Structures are given as C-alpha cells and as structure tokens.
Amino acid sequence: MDSGLQQLALCLFFILCRLFQATAEDDWKIATATLSRDRDGSSSVATGGACGYGDLRQSSFAGYSAGLSGKLFNRGSSCGACLEVRCVNHIRWCLQGSPSVVVTATDFCPPNSGLSSDYGGWCNFPKEHLELSHAAFTGIAETRAEMIPIQYRRVKCGRRGGLRFSLSGSSHFFQVLISNVGLDGEVVGVKVKGHTTAWIPMARNWGQNWHSSLDLIGQSLSFEVTLKGGKTIASYDVAPPYWRFGMTYQGKQFHS
C-alpha cells in the first residue's frame, strides 16, 4: 500500500473512532438532581411512592431509588426503569472523578408552581429532574449540596430472582403489582390467565399496578409481561389455585 492510501486509511480510522466516541457520549442526557428529604429536612429513603413498590429496603436495588419529574415519569410508565447517574461540572459538590450510581425509578417528583423551576421548583414541567435516595445521592455528591447538575442514561436492570407478582383486590377487582423486572425494567403490557380462561389483557391502574374486573379466585394464575423494548415473557401457573390476596409469587425473569 502506498503512503497516500496509508494516510487515507489512517484518517478514516480516526474519524470512525471519533464518531464512535461521540455516539457513546450522546447516550448521556443533562438533568439536575436533589436529595430526597422528609418534611423535617432529614434525608430519607423513599418507601414506594407513586410506583407502588412498598418498602424499598426490601427490594433488590438496596435503596438506590429516584423520584422522577413529570417529563421523565411519563404517567407511571417509567416505573422500574434503571438509570445510571453521575454528578458533573461542579467542583464543590461533585465527588472526585465523577463516579456513577445506578438507580431505579420508584416515585413521582411533583411540581411546585409557586416556585421558580430554577430555585425550588426543580420538578416543574418540562424540567428533567431526579430526586435521589440518600444512598444514591451520597454516592455521587456531597450531602450538603442542595441541587446538583447531573448526566443520566438508561441502562439494563440487573435483578436477582424472578419477576414478582403481588396480588390485591376483591372478588370483582383483581390487581397485581409487578416488580423486580430485569432488562429495561419498564412494563408496558400485562395479561393474566386463569386455568379456565384465555389470556386477558390488564390495564395500568397506577405505577406498576395492573388491574382487571375479573373473579379469578380459586384458579391458578399465569402472567404474560411485555417490556418497552418489545420483549415478552410468560410465567405459567405462578400462583396456585389456593392463592390469597396480599401474597407475592415469583415468575420467570427477563435476560439479555
């Protein structure tokens, strides 16, 4: 190969490397974050919130949770999503080296129309803002910080065990909370099947609670779950015929 072709090949190589690097960096989006606090000002770990997960200290993500502003929460469809977050561009508040943490979307951060979106109304539409649990916030920034600039990107959720189906309702109102979801974590469709019925679509009630006006008492239950990314998994006979409201049963798990 003559020198001209070698130089051209080398030039193309560096261009492709730069394009790959730019694409990787484009995965990160700009937002802001604050530490989730109780009314008395003490830091707290969210306990379920608008996604309905309950006591997060019992979850597989060990308190690494986040409440999302309305633009990110998307009326509950983002519940269960996993976000990698890092503090950037603030030498005083960001931890050295800009380490990142992975959080699970578990709550809604409500707007405050009485305050400016630049001071206090962090979750006003259309701001992209995360309210982080104590473990998550202190993993990337100083606790004393009031509001920090961050970058975030969606990542796959690493979960131990199978999908969890928590049952509630009555003889004419059947509801299931779906949690511990792997891959993108965002459930967009659910079907239920009793041993005497066909697959029946369920509707999102709130967060990751799905419901249907069915009487399935006394039937074994199977569930079909579809993620935002398009993958579907069916867990057959998850709950036996003698299942009870208030119980949680485990099914299959999504894997990449």
Curated annotation (Swiss-Prot):
The gene is EXPA20. The lineage of its organism: Eukaryota, Viridiplantae, Streptophyta, Embryophyta, Tracheophyta. It is a peripheral membrane protein. This is Expansin-A20. Gene3D superfamilies: Expansin, cellulose-binding-like domain (2.60.40.760), RlpA-like domain (2.40.40.10). Belongs to the expansin family. Expansin A subfamily. Residues 48-162 form the Expansin-like EG45 domain. Residues 172-251 form the Expansin-like CBD domain. PANTHER family: EXPANSIN-A15 (PTHR31867). Residues 1-24 form the signal peptide. One of its GO terms (cellular component) is membrane. SUPFAM superfamilies: Barwin-like endoglucanases, PHL pollen allergen.
